[in-house]
Amino acid sequence: MSQLNDISLVAQVVVFKNTRAFDQLVKEYQSPIRRFFLNLTCGDSELSDDLAQDTFIKAYTNIASFRNLSSFSTWLYRIAYNVFYDYIRSRKEKIGRAHV
């Protein structure tokens, strides 16, 4: 998908609350985001699916904050990275509490 098309779809989601436009973005980026998580989770497909879902939920919730300072994919991957970082941090906290 071209960056121009991504911007158009983002605008439709923000201005018109067009969920079908967001569905198109999900279709385009679902596989790459899932592969990103598969690499980070050593192939754990269930966890990768959960993290990808969290990424798209956060992207939809915060799509109005997309400022087109970078490509939509860069913005989405930053969200994905943050979702993974939050997951790792929560796991460390759970492990730390279990050993207390």
Ranges and model annotations:
Residues 65-67, 81-97:
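Arg/Lys-rich amphipathic alpha helix in sigma70-family domain 2
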Residues 50-57, 70-82:
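Structural recognition of an alpha-helix C-terminal capping motif at a helix-to-coil junction
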